[in-house]
Amino acid sequence: MKDSNKRFDYRVKRVRSKINGTHDKPRLSVYRGHKHIYAQIIDDSRGVTLASASTLSPELKGKLEINDTVEAAKSVGGLIAKKAVEKGVKKVVFDRRGYEYTGKIKALADTARESGLEF
């Protein structure tokens, strides 16, 4: 177990070292917990979170039966894209945080693209 955690931490550092959000193209960071999914749009040059969404957001909290499914990830992706477009953000850099680009991560990214964000 310890070795797999070390490998994951290495992947996180490797991916994060290559990705940096700017004012023009902020970073869309995704975290996948055991029970919930979180997404943030971050401007690294100023150190400011521009928008955030999760399965714990008031807009989604009562509407989802189970919070860790692909459908929940799609809902979070649509919500984060909606909030970003309201703030004037159209282009982002996708930070998958070492997770494989399948399942929930892919569903969140695809829905965010369909809702108006460009990666």
From Swiss-Prot:
GO terms for cellular component: cytosolic large ribosomal subunit. Gene3D superfamilies: 3.30.420.100. GO terms for biological process: translation. Part of the 50S ribosomal subunit; part of the 5S rRNA/L5/L18/L25 subcomplex. Contacts the 5S and 23S rRNAs. PANTHER family: 39S RIBOSOMAL PROTEIN L18, MITOCHONDRIAL (PTHR12899), LARGE RIBOSOMAL SUBUNIT PROTEIN UL18M (PTHR12899:SF3). HAMAP family: Ribosomal_uL18_B. This is Large ribosomal subunit protein uL18. It comes from Endomicrobium trichonymphae.
